[in-house]
Amino acid sequence: MAEPLLELDHVTAGYHGQAVLRDISLAIAEGSVVTIIGPNGHGKSTLLRTISGLVQPMSGEVRFDGQSLRGRKVHEIVALGVVHIPQGDLIFPDMTVRDNLLMGAYLPDAHAEADTRIVEIFSLLPKLEERQNQIARTLSGGERRMLGIGRGLMTGGQILLVDEPSLGLAPIVIDQIYAVITRLRDEGRTILLVEENVSRVSEIAESIHLLDNGSFVWQGPPEELQLHQEILETYLGG
C-alpha cells in the first residue's frame, strides 16, 4: 500500500499548554478529498493550523510526503507543498486582485512560475480575471473568498487545506465555490476540507471525519453518514 501523502500520528495540540486536539490520527492518500466536520470551537481550524505549522504539536507527529513537519517554520511547510487557505476573507484590501494573487507566489519556485500560474487561476476563476485590476476591498464577499482560494493556489502545492469555504456566503455563491473545489478534485488535487455544510461536502468527499471536543468520534464515507441521522442531530443540529 502506498504511503499517505499526509499523516497525523496521535497528535495532541493546542494553545498555552491547553490541549484542543487530543490524540488525533489521520491518513490522507494523494488525490483524495477528506472532510472534517463538527461543532464550532471543537478544534477543526486548530487541526489545519497544526498541519500548516501555525500551531506546534504537544505530542505526536505530522508527516507530509514521508517527512516530519515537527519544528519546521510555516514557509518551509509551504515550500514542501502544503497550502493553507484559512477561514474568512484574508486578503490585502488596498491592493489589486492581480497583486493579491502575486503575493501568493512569494516562494522562489512559485515566483518563477507566477505568470503561468496566474493564467491557470484565471481559467479556474474567470471572475478574478475580469476583476484583476480592481481594488480587492471593493469585491463582493464571494469574490473575496475566491481571491483567497486563488492566492493559495499561486503557491502551487500538493495538498490544499481549506477552512470553511462556504461560511457566511449566499447559496448561489456557495455553488460557485464548490464548483471550483469540484474541478480541483477532478484535476487530482489532494484536499483536506473543514466544513459545516454536510450536504455539500457529501457530494465531493471520499471520507468524512466528525470532530467533537478535540477528538474524532465518527469517520466513514458520506453515504454512511447520511444513514446516521442521530449523529447529525447530536453534533450538528440535524
Residue ranges of model-derived segments:
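Conserved ABC ATPase signature
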Residues: 135-139
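Helix-to-loop junction immediately C-terminal to a conserved catalytic motif
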Residues: 52
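The feature captures the beta-strand-to-loop junction immediately N-terminal to the Walker
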Residues: 37-39
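ABC-type ATPase nucleotide-binding domains, specifically the catalytic core motifs of the NBD
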Residues: 16, 34, 72, 97-116, ...
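Conserved ABC transporter NBD signature motif
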Residues: 60-68, 80, 113-118
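ABC ATPase C-loop
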Residues: 152-153
